């Protein structure tokens, strides 16, 4: 049932994207239908998981040479619903070797005993809960990429219902482009790296040229696989993260990947973002970064601090040293 409802949802989203492209807008009836579908999906899945909890181990028993690590983070306002997201990650058609939830010590001073019962039950089925410094959304990659440096790390958000084939599709892309960062959804960076993120666009259905490229920005939350050595050491500079790009891990990872010469690949056929858990969008970083324009500010910070990139992605340090000195004073 879960997979069937997702197929219907994807069909509606693709139909809407075709219509929006031809009509330049979404009809009201379509938006109402889509909202109803998302509402029905939320009711169906939450009731299903409540009434029929899964008691089986939800990580693989197969010994892999290179493990699959799913990493995500959350904060107090979503600690009561993140178990839904984790459940969808546990019920993937391809199982992970480990699912790690990173929590900030400062936000959960009571430790494991103060966490919801659902999360503690998931620990018995393979969930790992780790406590760390508070780096906001950057927690989901910062520690995992360093601790599991030889494994494949898959990033996830804390407010989504993931389709059962998410890990499967990421691994399929990884086999085609083993050194690339592979993501389910992305944004096209155009016309140049100097343009504001608010001007970038979403891919069209079946758009070509979005694999093994430096022309896209990964939406890490939709599901993103990062192979070993994809990011440079400077990607783990806490002070730079907090000063330059505190709210946008997507921008930080994509910028650092391009800076490191790592290409990014997304699906050949456009797939919409996963369905959100109702009640979580209010505090979403989407509104801070997108609606409030913080993406533009943070991208400008990165370009000025590290040096701009030319149209082909090549790095230039022109004007960067002076800006580094001024920014460093505030770090």
Regions found by a protein language model. Give the residues of each.
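C-terminal catalytic/acceptor-binding lobe
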Residues: 2-48, 233, 239-331
């Amino acid at each position: 049932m879960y997979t069937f409802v997702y197929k219907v949802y994807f069909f509606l989203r693709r139909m809407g994207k075709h219509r929006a492209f031809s009509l330049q807008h979404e009809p009201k009836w379509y938006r109402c239908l889509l909202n109803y579908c998302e509402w029905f999906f939320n009711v169906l899945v939450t009731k299903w998981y409540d009434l029929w909890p899964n008691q089986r181990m939800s990580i693989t028993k197969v010994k892999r040479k290179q493990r699959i690590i799913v990493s995500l983070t959350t904060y107090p306002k979503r600690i009561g619903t993140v178990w839904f997201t984790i459940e969808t990650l546990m019920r993937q058609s391809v199982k992970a070797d480990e699912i790690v939830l990173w929590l900030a010590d400062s936000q959960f001073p009571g430790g494991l005993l103060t966490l919801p019962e659902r999360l503690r039950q998931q620990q018995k089925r393979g969930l790992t809960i780790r406590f760390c410094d508070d780096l906001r959304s950057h927690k989901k990659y910062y520690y995992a990429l360093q601790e599991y440096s030889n494994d494949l790390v898959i990033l996830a958000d804390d407010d989504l219902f993931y389709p059962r084939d998410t890990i499967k599709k990421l691994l399929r892309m990884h086999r085609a482009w083993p050194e690339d960062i592979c993501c389910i959804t992305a944004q096209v960076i155009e016309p140049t790296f100097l343009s504001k993120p608010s001007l970038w666009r979403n891919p069209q259905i079946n758009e070509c040229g979005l694999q093994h490229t430096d022309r896209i920005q990964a939406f890490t939350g939709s599901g993103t696989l990062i192979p070993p050595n994809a990011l440079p050491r400077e990607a783990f500079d806490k002070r730079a993260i907090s000063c330059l790009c505190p709210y946008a891990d997507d921008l930080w990872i994509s910028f650092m990947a391009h800076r490191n010469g790592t290409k990014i690949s997304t699906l050949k056929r456009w797939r919409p973002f996963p369905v959100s858990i109702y009640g979580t969008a209010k505090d979403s970083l989407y509104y801070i970064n997108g609606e409030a324009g913080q993406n533009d500010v943070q991208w400008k910070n990165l370009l000025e601090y590290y040096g701009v990139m030319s149209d082909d992605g090549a790095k230039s340090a022109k004007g960067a040293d002076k800006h580094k000195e001024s920014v460093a004073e505030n770090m």
